[in-house]
UniProtKB/Swiss-Prot annotation:
This is NADH-quinone oxidoreductase chain 1. GO terms for cellular component: plasma membrane. FMN binds at residues 167-214. The keyword tRNA processing does not apply. NAD(+) binds at residues 54-63.
Length: 431
């Protein structure tokens, strides 16, 4: 279990003062100018050594991502864009940072922008996050008044401006290039790659898009050192991380823990255990709605990190899990997710535009048991045709929960079809 002195987000639950004065008391904005004066290369090398991987779901090494930005300007400005469009069902970790500990994000944005040669950064915040936007804007205004942003930001000699942009509630804008399109005032639709954002991103200029948590942990890593951060977790899965627990746990929460914590320990220590005890566990979606669902047996010894989730044929994602007990109709739960992805498809790619709707309709029939057993395999085959055949990962996100359901809960689907045929279809369980 993570010790309190090792926590980065010390006001995660809003028990303290979120203002600039409160943030300084908790150690933020301490020696920021000295960190910047180390130079771009040393900061990026330190981030690489820390082993920090993107906290938005993809898990790409953060230091390496920063190193893709041009070392010398060709006349175009560079930009940092922070993805605060946290829209995936069950994922609610970044909003706690913005609502209660916004200065971790603002200080991180200054340091990260300097490391990439960017004099401006944009925070693209989800349309529904009204209170979070107010808290973040108030914190930004405080920093401008205190000289921590603007000309000679924090006395570092680096000029830096930070802008907050409110989205309009589209899940697809969480994809980095769709986010850039939306930020430019266009319809949020993913771009073809290459060119990658580091070559031609916002307004055709070099751009890096990072998740809120990825940026917010930067100042603490650089203060305490890469070795400190890398000491948590295991190789390739280093550091501390925000985990979310929702669903049928006794105490749903967002909690900061070390990477590579066993799933069962996370649920029992921080989630207060499964409602009705561990034996009442039926399934877990481990990292947000797009991850393949796991059975109770798989969860018993599963490790919550990138490699651990890959070992059980799922995904670490955002590490915000949905816990389902025996009262859950898991087939209907996955249908609900397929409905979400169908609704949020931008329609640009045919496999996603047509496939998400088709998968949702077949799932709806499977929920009712109004299908043939052979259709289960056909549905699985179609998910494989959608997966990997779209510009962005929304097609994959729609396919994976269904694939996990068929792999791990096929008997439940078949039983429902047989029960419908024999007239034994009972009352449906809770979702």
């Amino acid at each position: 279990m993570l010790n309190d002195q090792d926590r980065i987000f010390t006001n995660l639950y809003g028990m303290g003062d979120r203002s600039l004065a409160g943030a300084k008391k908790r150690g933020h904005w301490d020696g920021t100018a000295a960190i910047i004066q180390r130079g771009r290369d040393k900061i990026i090398d330190e981030m690489k050594a820390s082993g920090l991987r993107g906290r938005g779901g993809a898990g790409f090494p953060t230091g390496m991502k920063w190193s893709f930005m041009p070392k010398e300007s060709d006349g175009r400005p560079s930009y940092l864009v922070i993805n605060a469009d946290e829209s995936e069902p069950a994922t609610c970790k970044d909003r706690e940072i913005m609502r209660h500990d916004p200065h971790t994000l603002i200080e991180g944005a200054l340091i990260a922008s300097f490391a990439m040669g960017a004099h401006a950064a944009y925070i693209y915040i989800r349309g529904e996050f009204i209170r979070e936007r107010e808290a973040l804007q108030a914190a930004i205004d405080e920093c401008y008044d205190a000289g921590l942003l603007g000309r000679n930001a924090a006395g570092s000699g680096w000029d830096f401006d930070l802008y907050l942009h409110h989205g309009a509630g589209a899940y697809i804008c969480g994809e980095e290039t769709a986010l850039l399109e939306s930020l430019e005032g266009k319809k949020g639709m993913p771009r073809m790659k290459p060119p990658f954002p580091a070559g031609a991103g916002l307004y055709g200029c070099p751009t890096t898009v990072n998740n809120v948590e990825s940026i917010a942990v930067v100042p603490t890593i650089l203060r305490r050192g890469a070795e400190w951060f890398a000491s948590f977790g295991r190789p390739n899965n280093a550091g501390v991380k925000l985990f979310g627990l929702t669903g049928h746990v006794n105490t749903p929460c967002v909690v900061e823990e070390a990477m590579s914590i066993p799933m069962r320990e996370l649920i029992e220590k921080h989630g207060g255990g499964i409602r009705g005890g561990w034996k009442n566990l039926k399934a877990v979606i481990p990292g947000g709605a797009s991850c393949p669902v796991l059975t109770a047996e798989q969860c018993e010894n599963a490790i919550m990190d990138y490699d651990g989730m890959r070992d059980v044929r799922s995904s670490f994602g955002t590490a915000c899990m949905i816990v389902m007990d025996q009262s859950t109709d898991v087939v209907k739960a996955i249908w609900r997710l397929s409905k979400f992805f169908k609704h949020e498809s931008c329609g640009q790619c045919t496999p996603c535009r047509e496939g998400t709707g088709w998968m949702m309709r077949v799932m709806e029939r499977l929920v009712r048991g109004d299908a043939e057993v052979e259709e289960i395999d056909m549905l699985f085959d179609v998910t494989k045709q959608v997966e990997g055949h779209t510009i962005c990962a929304l097609g994959d996100a729609a396919a994976w929960p269904i694939q996990g359901l068929i792999r791990n809960f096929r008997e439940e689907i078949e039983d429902r079809i047989k029960a419908k045929r024999t007239g034994r279809m009972g009352a449906m369980a809770a979702e």
